[in-house]
Amino acid sequence: MSLFEGWPDLVCFDLDGTLIDSVPDISKALDIALQSVGAAKAGEERARAWVGFGSSKLVSQALEWSGTSIDTHESCHSAFLKAYFESVSENTTLYPNVEALLKAFKYNGVPMALITNKPSVFVKPILEHFGLSDYFSWQLGGDTLEEKKPSPVPLLHCSESIEAAPERCLMIGDSVADARAAQAANFKSVLVSYGYNHGIELSTLNPDVVIDDLAELLM
């Protein structure tokens, strides 16, 4: 890997928009939640633009879009969590070459972490559904630690636990939260172009590399 001399000492992966396309299931649950408080359905494309900063923020954005009182946030958020848990992997898919990359890192002895802003209750079921759980020594949700991305805390939690120098560590993600967390932690960063980037030109986030396919990291 050209970003490092040899293999990195640690690789941290984002989940939604990086390893999996989860929007079909997220948007379905969000629409159920919105309807439960008398709001209109948002639909998949709108939900795609809101994903990435955790479920509470997602619900807040949806309520604001629909013109519904923020006073309904607690009940709407609870309805979303319930609906999403019931169909967390129903229509979610892996992006191409995810398993090939994970296998390559594992074969070469690279520790891996899964760091997402998604509530931790959803992380294990999704990883187990796709048979990916055993690849990750850390599985951190947005509520696992006191801070979540774009804070560097989750990244440094992992690197410090194995005494890995930050400059020898890599964050792979798709969004501004991933880029900012990596920069604050002094990790190298790779952003994927196919994820949930909220219309931001990824090069403006100053990642080390932007790729269109995870297979590019195997070249």
State where each predicted segment sits.
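Helix-loop "lid/cap" segments that line or gate small-molecule binding pockets
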Residues: 33-34, 54-69, 126, 158-159
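Metal-dependent phosphoesterase signature
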Residues: 61-100
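An amphipathic alpha-helix signature
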Residues: 27, 31, 44, 48, ...
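Asp-based, Mg2+/Mn2+-dependent phosphohydrolase catalytic module
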Residues: 1-10, 106, 120, 124-219
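Catalytic-core regions built around general acid/base machinery
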Residues: 97-109
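Active-site neighborhood of HAD-like aspartate-dependent phosphohydrolases
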Residues: 2-49
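Helix N-cap/coil-helix junction residues
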Residues: 39, 65-68, 132, 164
